[in-house]
Amino acid sequence: SNEVFFLRDNQLMFPNAVKDKLVKTSDGWALDIYVFSPRPLDDLLIEPNMPKLTLVVKARECQLAINDKAYAAVSQNRHEATYKELPLLQGWNKVSIKIGQIDKNEFTGNFRCDNRNEFLSSLKVMYINPEAK
């Protein structure tokens, strides 16, 4: 289905249909996705070899929150924002993306794992919280 996040060239790509999931806000567009990680990624001190997950969002304006905590981009240029070492917890994580008014048409994104590509295939991504009652 064209709604599924898919692996290509060592990236977990946002599908084209993701644009249809954007919700209008007062100052732009918002998307919540739910990312399942088989292991916690939030404590690099314990395990130096832990997968380092990156999210790249194609948008001129972007804000990210992970499990409702704001998370800063390491870089933001005219075309995209890059978020590194996402502190996902083990299990399902809410990833909230906000983009600007003019960003909807170009909007896309991908997850990368610079140090352990094989980790990407163990992630799951959904649009609806699978744990919501």
Please provide the spans of the model-predicted regions.
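Short, solvent-exposed beta-strand-to-loop segments that form ligand-recognition rims
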Residues: 71-79
